[in-house]
Amino acid sequence: MRKILLPYPAGCATGTFVRRVKRFSVEMTRDGESVWVHSNNSGSMLGLLRPGATMLASPAANPDRKLAWTHEAMRCHGDGPQGFWVGVNTSVPNRMVEAAFHAGRLPWAQGYDTFRRERKRGDSRLDARLDGPGLPTLWVECKNVTMVEDDVACFPDAVTERGSKHLREMMDIVSRGERAAMFYLVQRPDGLCFGPADVIDPQYAALFWEAVDAGVEMYPHRGIVSPVGIDLSGVLPLTRCR
């Protein structure tokens, strides 16, 4: 059996989702007690945060942190055989792309031998810079995808001016002769293709297709989420969300 690229920390726990408060705090019940969990997801997590749904939390690496748990995943469509996990931790795509690079699991990064995270370019800081002998520098920006509508995995699930800025930056990179790639980690299994959510953020959607035409590479990889961790699967085809 192939090793999972990103195993969850030891000591993860499931509980029942109660509510979200002030965007970055989630209440769950576990063994009849209320537990507050940190969420790093600033998006809407549209359709996932249903009271009574099962959620997964990991223990904080820092024992002195105010909230002792981190929100990792939500159960969608129940706990039965039709249900599945959806990963909501937005730090996962950055860690996944690095782990996949070192494991040789990114076909579009073949030949590159150096991975540097969070590198500055101009006034921006991008998630990763890859270099290799005789190859153009490859800049990578990572996004987490949790929404699926009519079999289409969509991003974003809330208006994102920051995301639009990243697309403009990636187009500028390509115009200067370097490579630019968007790594979208679709942390759920039911998306058959991928596209920008034009109903939610028309500006981002328009810039997405402009970036495609400009030569920005789009890699919406499917993530395989389980209670023990996340693995990486293939790239979904692009489509328009209509």
Curated annotation (Swiss-Prot):
It comes from the Bacteria. InterPro entries: SfsA, SfsA_C, SfsA_N. Transmembrane segments: none annotated. Belongs to the SfsA family. HAMAP family: SfsA. NCBIfam families: sfsA. This is Sugar fermentation stimulation protein homolog. It comes from Nitratidesulfovibrio vulgaris (strain ATCC 29579 / DSM 644 / CCUG 34227 / NCIMB 8303 / VKM B-1760 / Hildenborough).
